[in-house]
Amino acid sequence: MDFFEINLTAVVQLLNFLFLLWILNKLLYKPFLGMMEKRKEKIEGEIVEAEKLRKQAEEIKKNAEEELKNARIRAEQIIASANSESEKIVEEAKQKAQKEAEKILQNAYLEIEKQKQEALAQVQTIATELAINLAMKVLKGTLDEKAKREYLAKVIKEYEK
């Protein structure tokens, strides 16, 4: 019968233990879960933002490629125009027509190259900035400084290709 008797010390210890669990739950566990949920929501928001930035970068790249294509078409039109003009001038004076056609073609090629270089530089600058912003938002607070730098270097190398 001693086995089934209630030991007052054991009951008090059990109540103290339950009270301690309740305190720990209120003071540590619930705030910790709340903090983790906020962090999860923040990361999910940053992932959504990163996806938006990636889509914007793709749109900018697409627009730059379209501008480059238009520049090539314009250059071809300039070249075609220069060729027809040079044919007319050749009829009047062969020497003068040949020099003028070469000058027009040279200017057209220089303009094409200039526009091409500007478009490529613009695309690379925008893509690099977006990649850095994207990486910084995604990596903010999740990696140590060395890991951030290595990841950023990797992203920049990929965009430079």
UniProtKB/Swiss-Prot annotation:
TM segment ranges: 10-29
Identify the keywords attached in UniProt to this record, alphabetized: ATP synthesis, Cell inner membrane, Cell membrane, CF(0), Hydrogen ion transport, Ion transport, Membrane, Transmembrane, Transmembrane helix, Transport
Gene Ontology CC terms, in alphabetical order: plasma membrane; proton-transporting ATP synthase complex
One Pfam family in the UniProt entry: ATP-synt_B
What's the chief localization of this chain? membrane
Q: Give the way it sits in the membrane.
A: Single-pass membrane protein
Name the InterPro entries on file: ATP_synth_B-like_membr_sf (IPR028987), ATP_synth_b/b'su_bac/chlpt (IPR002146), ATP_synth_F0_bsu_bac (IPR005864), ATP_synthase_B_chain (IPR050059)
The cross-references to SUPFAM superfamilies, in alphabetical order and at most eight, read: F1F0 ATP synthase subunit B, membrane domain (SSF81573)
Q: Which GO terms describe its molecular function?
A: proton-transporting ATP synthase activity, rotational mechanism; proton-transporting ATPase activity, rotational mechanism
Q: Where in the cell is it found?
A: Cell inner membrane
SS bonds (residue pairs): none
What does it do? F(1)F(0) ATP synthase produces ATP from ADP in the presence of a proton or sodium gradient. F-type ATPases consist of two structural domains, F(1) containing the extramembraneous catalytic core and F(0) containing the membrane proton channel, linked together by a central stalk and a peripheral stalk. During catalysis, ATP synthesis in the catalytic domain of F(1) is coupled via a rotary mechanism of the central stalk subunits to proton translocation. Component of the F(0) channel, it forms part of the peripheral stalk, linking F(1) to F(0).
Q: Which family does it belong to?
A: Belongs to the ATPase B chain family.
* Subunit relationships: F-type ATPases have 2 components, F(1) - the catalytic core - and F(0) - the membrane proton channel. F(1) has five subunits: alpha(3), beta(3), gamma(1), delta(1), epsilon(1). F(0) has three main subunits: a(1), b(2) and c(10-14). The alpha and beta chains form an alternating ring which encloses part of the gamma chain. F(1) is attached to F(0) by a central stalk formed by the gamma and epsilon chains, while a peripheral stalk is formed by the delta and b chains.
This protein is called what? ATP synthase subunit b
Organism for this UniProt entry: Fervidobacterium nodosum (strain ATCC 35602 / DSM 5306 / Rt17-B1)
